[in-house]
């Protein structure tokens, strides 16, 4: 019997990093089914609250259901408490839900980033419900080893917003060069105290200088 879980878990590249005043989340937009490109415009970053975003890697249906559950629970929390849920509380809620279903797991790997009273933060959450608060940078998916190479080398604490966005895009592009499951354009989300901003960057490389022929 073919075990497809490992294949499902790998096909993407998502990146999260903290800058001075906020968080940047970035993903490429290719969706794959085995060796086939199923979509070139796949959405992999979802807004959970006005200050929280979630990146998804893994099974599309599983990820979308979890997004809907989180959105509803966060809305109910705000209606009952009169305030928005913190990033840490939302990651704990997600972690608990995944752990309760560990024997029938959701095939996902998730990054949650946002801004609350404690400032910007990023959490990684696995299919078994394990949640980790990351210090500054994180990447998931099949392209993550390539993205980490760029992030580890070029990330600096206290980066400004524009520099952080540029680094996130370069990290995803680096993964796209070597990971066949990552490709197309790049979705970038910036979350600060005052905004949730989403835009698309080209996945294509800038033209390089002509190389001499042999």
Curated annotation (Swiss-Prot):
The EC category is hydrolase
Quote the subcellular location field of this record. Answer: Cytoplasm
PROSITE patterns named in the record? PROTEASOME_BETA_1, PROTEASOME_BETA_2
Q: List the propeptide region positions.
A: 1-11
Q: Tell me, what controls this protein's activity?
A: The formation of the proteasomal ATPase PAN-20S proteasome complex, via the docking of the C-termini of PAN into the intersubunit pockets in the alpha-rings, triggers opening of the gate for substrate entry. Interconversion between the open-gate and close-gate conformations leads to a dynamic regulation of the 20S proteasome proteolysis activity.
Q: Name one Pfam family in it.
A: Proteasome
Record keywords: Cytoplasm included? yes
Q: Which GO terms describe its cellular component?
A: cytoplasm; proteasome core complex, beta-subunit complex
According to its UniProt record, which protein family does this protein belong to? Belongs to the peptidase T1B family.
Partners and quaternary state?
A: The 20S proteasome core is composed of 14 alpha and 14 beta subunits that assemble into four stacked heptameric rings, resulting in a barrel-shaped structure. The two inner rings, each composed of seven catalytic beta subunits, are sandwiched by two outer rings, each composed of seven alpha subunits. The catalytic chamber with the active sites is on the inside of the barrel. Has a gated structure, the ends of the cylinder being occluded by the N-termini of the alpha-subunits. Is capped at one or both ends by the proteasome regulatory ATPase, PAN.
State its role: Component of the proteasome core, a large protease complex with broad specificity involved in protein degradation.
Q: What is this protein called?
A: Proteasome subunit beta
Q: Which organism is it from?
A: Methanoculleus marisnigri (strain ATCC 35101 / DSM 1498 / JR1)
């Amino acid at each position: 019997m073919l075990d497809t879980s490992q294949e499902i878990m790998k096909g993407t590249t998502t990146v999260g990093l903290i800058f001075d005043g906020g968080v940047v989340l970035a993903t490429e937009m290719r969706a794959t089914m085995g060796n086939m490109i199923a979509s070139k415009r796949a959405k992999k970053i979802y807004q959970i609250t006005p200050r929280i975003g979630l990146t998804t890697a893994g099974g599309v249906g599983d990820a979308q259901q979890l997004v809907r559950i989180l959105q509803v629970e966060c809305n109910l929390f705000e209606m009952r408490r009169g305030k928005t849920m913190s990033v840490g509380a939302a990651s704990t809620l997600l972690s608990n839900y995944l752990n309760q279903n560990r024997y029938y797991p959701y095939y996902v790997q998730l990054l949650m980033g946002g801004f609350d009273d404690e400032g910007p933060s990023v959490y990684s959450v696995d299919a078994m419900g394990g949640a980790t608060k990351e210090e500054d940078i994180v990447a998931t998916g099949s392209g993550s080893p390539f993205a980490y190479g760029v992030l580890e080398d070029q990330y600096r604490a206290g980066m400004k917003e524009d520099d952080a966005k540029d680094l996130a895009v370069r990290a995803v592009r680096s993964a796209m060069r070597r990971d066949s499951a990552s490709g197309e354009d790049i979705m970038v989300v910036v979350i600060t105290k005052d905004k949730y901003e989403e835009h698309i960057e080209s996945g294509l490389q800038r033209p390089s200088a002509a190389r001499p022929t042999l």
